[in-house]
Amino acid sequence: MQPLCRLYGSGVAQCTCAVLGGVDAYYTPFVRLEKGEIRNKDRRDVSPEENTVPRLVPQVIASDPEELKVLTDFLASQGYREIDVNMGCPFPLIVRRGKGAGILSSPEKVEALLEMMKVFPEIRFSVKMRLGGQDAEEWKALVPLLNRSCVTQVTLHPRIGKQQYKGAVDREAFRAFYEACERPLVYNGDLLTVADIRGGTGSVSPAERGDAGTRAADESGAGAGFP
């Protein structure tokens, strides 16, 4: 569904909600700055007048705190109280700009974004990420930052950015991340069948943790979105 969302914008979510239903939350394509300004297309995609789904969560992508602040100020002015920050997009053009998975190799930059979130206590921030940008061990430096942050949910796609969507997802790495992460966790990646959803979290049961445990989400714009 992601290609359709990029082509047709918010109308895809409206149609899916009206015809199919059963989706807890819809996450938008990236809201981002272009030459210092929010794109008109992005403004339309998150316009309250254009959206009738019960729960729409804007997804933003940023490389520095000031960029995140501009995006958050705008979305808060539109009445949003949930924002998802993408640190997982693997596409080279995004990565080269230090956004998406391109930020994961720089823990200090990730920490700066997490600190900016604290400036907006009225907003519930979530984070979407991968195991790393270039190395599957990079997450180990990031989990302590997430545990100290105000994020309310982490979505993990267990590949590195360099892989994009090639190769197998690393379910054992997801398990290790789960054991280290103190935030509610969502699994994302290669969920094509019901069996994939049941087995996708590396045999982690939500019952193993007293909080929200783990959930599985697809890459369609419903559930966790697009890392």
What do the predicted segments below correspond to?
Residues 1-227:
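Flavin-dependent oxidoreductase catalytic cores
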